[in-house]
Amino acid sequence: MSIPSILRKETLKKKDKNIDLQENNINDLVVSASRVIAPLWPISTFAAHHPWMGLEKQSFEQVANWLKEARNVDIYPSASMIHSAKAKGEIEESFLQIALSRWLDSQSFHMPRETAERFCQEALKLERLPSSLLSSPELNKLAEEINYVNTGSMKDSSMQPISSLIENQNGDNLSDILNYHIIKWCKLYLDDAGASWAMPNREKGFYRAWQHLITFDPALSKTERKVLKDWPEDALIALTKALSELGISESNMQAYLEGHLLSLPGWAGMIRWRSQQSIEEQELLIEYLAVRLSMELAIVKPYLPLKNQKVEKKVSIVPLIASWIYWGDISIEKWLQMSATEQSELLAFAYRFDENTRKKLWLEAWEQTHAEQLREKIASKQRATHDKKRVVAQLAFCIDVRSEPFRRHLEKLGPFETFGIAGFFGLPIATTELGSNDSHPSLPVILKPKHQIKELTDENECKSYEQRKMVGSSVRYTFKTMKQNVLTSMLLPEVSGPLLGLQMVTRSFVPRRVGGFIRNLRKNMLQKPDTTFSLNHVHDTNCEIPIGFTKEEKVNYVRQTLKMVGLTEGFAPLVVMCGHSSQSTNNPYAAALECGACGGAAGGFNARVFATLCNLPEVREALSAEGIKIPDDTIFAAAEHKTTVDELEWIYVPELSETAQEAFDCIEAIMPNVSQHANRERLMQLPHFKTKIKNPSKEAHRFAEDWSEIRPEWGLARNASFIIGQRELTQECDLEGRAFLHNYDWKQDESGDILANIIAGPGTVAQWINLQYYASTVAPHYYGSGNKATQTVTAGLGVMQGNASDLLPGLPWQSVMQSDRETYHSPLRLLIVIQAPTKYIERLLNNNFTFREKVQNGWVRLASVDPEGRWKNW
């Protein structure tokens, strides 16, 4: 078999078969093509998502190879990341050897095993081939001699937009010009907050609004405007016509649409998210593609037809030969002495053991090292014996990794028991705070709210509160109006300069004091009166979802949550539901530090609603009849864990029983110590601190109030595992704030439904968070959002670099990097550890096809710990 045919065969093996055109319908093609982008939520409700959620039917390896080929995006850790991790002891060499041996066993080759192993061992050092070798005349002459047959071996890459293949007379790529225009139109249409003048005809939809304006666009030439002058009024017809006139064959249409969606994945992701929010905009992605391809046609029409619209990349055998010379110790003289069959065998092997394969093995070794270290921590805890202490209070925290250190110190310093559960506490609600007409879905973005809960108070108190709020709103509105008005904007610097100048100086030099003063002033002015909730079911035809709960629903949600964490008996005198929130200043990514389980909002509202439900006599009576007996002196309260300063703020404390009051006083007494310990542990991870911190709480507050601080906290960086089991499994284990912790008692889950719900809900959210951090670390230029210091907040939607970039979809550099050269986040795929018998895991995988697919395709890793403490990797 010839060298080209062998390489072509290997290419087809590695090719990601993401395109399989079956339908002629453009609607179906757009839906299929949209899998290559992920919905992008507005930054104000920043929701974790992973960019490959539509591609999970393929393996992680296939998607990695496809992205490398189609967009030159590498989603495996870089060589520098791998070397750094190895130097820090995060990668055991033995696991790399196991991964290599497993890979070699899966391959078919006829050379001696020792030869293959020696080549791989050298290649795994991840050294670049010397440029002097690659450019040497002897090597290139050898490549020409070996390539004695027609080198028809091609990498059939995805079809690129025609505009990306053409440059104008100034040397500018037409795809860059097209992107500039599309960004401008997207900003105009999607703006919900920034512009004083809305886009004309916006209510008619993106395409129609664009069509009314495009022929007046001075940024287009007269010839380009002429092409679009009599363009169809229907977006679908326009898209079909553009594809036809661009000469895109039916078999290439989906690939072509994918190429355009991947050109600006941020803006396309925002468009896709908007299309999922309302019936009126459900065709928005079609409209976006119609606008984009119509404009592409206008820009490239003078250059049509092109001779070859499909990019074909030949596989160069020069680096393949060079790799055997450099890593396999096969000289040019030896190459010339080989037969064609032997040469083909070596080249095919080098082609298979490419850079992606090498990095894949390193990643697997890195992940296995982490899994083994976690197993040893859990095993050492199980071997130790601890006396069961009397518990005076039980506190339920969100599964968020930032809760783990706080819980650990809390349990160590006092007679407390903690639980982990998704921070929306199983309540599928949309919340409306006092004095607001807007509701916010306070649950994971993968779910839809079923109930609306309003915060209520006495009518007179409400009016007084609204008047106080209106004062602040009026000042902000006046400032914004003056800033955006043509005439008053020139006067604004004179009017506001002294005040804003004073704010700048004080915020910069004494941030903690000024921040505390402003926060206290705001708190005093906007002090909420005592409030209640609209908990009882009310049928309102003006609301899309019902207000409040029926009695059965109240009981059901409380029962479901208590069973999910295994808290159905042994209640302490005080049970505290702890939501969490963050505290930072001048931070566009503030929502990213809030509760992901509450849709990028604080979790206190849900915690308070749930605690209130648990205190209702009707709920307790119904639960008692089912065997869940909550003692009369047990009181449920609610608090909010402030993750930036590691403090617990009480938000709902009803009248307490005597024993509950004692527990409350106990928590209050030790909380300063808990905050000090948790803050010290967290702050020492920040790059600013290398020595002992005298006053951790004071420093934490400074970080929270400093408006120049680009890293008030690490957020969920370094997350690596999701442990589902009883607290005894990990109690007193220092998990370094890297684990999501969800309580689960398999003995109370005979049907397996509770475990299935944990995997489908919190498990999915944890996976999305994990892969968003992963993507922002390994490919920050494509999936991250760059440097916070140079970002521009755009249209109230997200951030850009400058004023004409893609809408940046991921996390900023400061969220994942320790410095310019050192990462902080370890890019590992999430390890899900379940404490349950083997048959529970088998049943879960058999019944949950989606989860089984994620495990098999390498999007998550799975391990279990059986009742005897035995660890099993799945």
Curated annotation (Swiss-Prot):
Its cofactor is Zn(2+). Belongs to the inorganic carbon transporter (TC 9.A.2) DabA family. It is a peripheral membrane protein. InterPro entries: DabA. GO terms for molecular function: zinc ion binding. Forms a complex with DabB. It is found in: Cell membrane. Zn(2+) binds at C398, D400, H580, C595. GO terms for cellular component: plasma membrane. Keywords: Cell membrane, Membrane, Metal-binding, Transport, Zinc. Pfam families: DabA. PANTHER family: INORGANIC CARBON TRANSPORTER SUBUNIT DABA-RELATED (PTHR38344:SF1), UPF0753 PROTEIN AQ_863 (PTHR38344). It comes from Bacillus anthracis. Part of an energy-coupled inorganic carbon pump. Expression of both dabA and dabB (DA2) restores growth in ambient air to E.coli deleted of its carbonic anhydrase genes (called CAfree, deletion of 'can' and 'cynT'). The lineage of its organism: Bacteria, Bacillati, Bacillota, Bacilli, Bacillales. It comes from the Bacteria. This is Probable inorganic carbon transporter subunit DabA.
